[in-house]
Amino acid sequence: MRFLVILIFVNIVIADYGGGYAGSGFQYGSSAREFSLAGALVADKTPGFCVFSNPALLQFTRSNQVGVSFQNMSLDRSIQSFNYAKRLPPNAGVGLAILQSGTDNIQGRNLMNQETESFSAKEIEGIMSFGVAFGSKLALGINIKAVFATIDKDYKGNGISGDIGFIYKLNRHLLIGGIMKNLNASYNWKVIIGEDERSYEEKFPRSYSLGMAYSGLKGISLFFQEDVMITPNNDVNYHTRIGSEFRLANKTKLRFGAKQARGTTPSGTIMNGLNIKPTFGIGTPLKVWQRQYTQLDYALDPGSVGEGLSHLFSFSFKF
């Protein structure tokens, strides 16, 4: 246990993240609950959004599930996601999902650093998922993803990739999960410069995640996830995530998490404080009619580098 605590601490302090690479717009989080728990959901049955966390979790689907997320963020950024999951008897599930991440009102500049027109950039990810259980302990799942990117009107990219995930049930309170993301993933860009069209390939970093979800404490769930990211240049970076969820008497849930705040820094850079960014949020069921409820989740992102507050909302329901 002491070694595990030291390992977690060291990974948080020296961790790196995937910003600045192809597909980084998909890493922020698909829902408010995911963000408030620091993204440590690779082994958790997230209602309405499990396709984004781990396709192997689809085998836990017992009814039709829908998840919708609206995230209007500072600096004209936004993320929207939709997820649909359906049970396939006796022990499988299928899902469809889409996520869009974008930024508006980007100020353009020419080679002389003079302001030109404003433009927008966005990334879209469409996912088809399937998960199946093999007995009572093990489940496997796959994602097939189509990705699209647009920067203004002259820069467009697309590609196809996949994910493979697993879930292992140690007991009814402890789940172990893992996923390999962005297998064979890249953008095939087409760029228009004047009257010429040029093409090139930009590869995604590969990501390997392993985590657990524990619900053996009364009214408390604990989550842990360790990510290993391998960049196109074969640099290896680490990312540790920890989350906790507290269930109150009125079915309201308080959520807290912690993840890295910064990536690697140049030699000689002075770092003030630990490399940790706290996350938090809340969730509550809302009655729609009779016995039908929808789950409302909220998370607040205070920002990492002074970019301002961002408010994240998600809705999920079963039918």
What is each residue range found by the language model?
Residues F3-V13:
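Sec-dependent N-terminal signal peptides
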Residues D16-F319:
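Subset of outer-membrane beta-barrel
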